[in-house]
Amino acid sequence: MKAVRQYGLEGVRIQNISKLAGVSPGALYRYFDSKEQLMMECFTYVDKQAAGIFDCMKFDPRNMLTDPMEAVRSLWVPYFRFWLARPDETVFYHRFRDSAFFPAYDKSRDASYFDRFVGMVQVFWEAFPNLRQINQDLLWLHVLTSTVMYAKYVVEGVLPDNQETEDTIFRFLTEGLSGYLISDKDKNRKLQSRNTE
């Protein structure tokens, strides 16, 4: 993963990987048939770690009804911070998911290790049926892939690693531009109407 971060997904060679690992290229070929197989195994390794976040998480579905945005945030923050804590894995994962062969690979792979996360999503679908109207590929590209992309920008130093960045990314992912295209006058009106309800 460190080699992909340094040389890019297409530019990395088995020789680069073996040098960083401190082994001969031949030693890698004893375990992997090709660079592509090694990349897929690395992806699966990191993907399973990301799925493990949700396996350990305490999730109370009732929170969706009382504070849906906080329920989403309680799932999103650990996922985002997972990527911030792993710079090499984050850059690798983003580049692998962004590659031309990923969509076909993604449709054919076994991702059953995400079953707990899928169960959480189904609870959201039941509470908010309008989520089913969204193209699911587009929804997950927006939420999960964009989260990894923003984390990549943070670990590469393009965005600052601070609370303001985290809050802004979450707000942008959940509200989009419409959350920012409100004048102060409209914002005050909304606040007043909420307070009178």
What are these regions (language model features)?
Residues 3-37, 41:
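Helix-turn-helix
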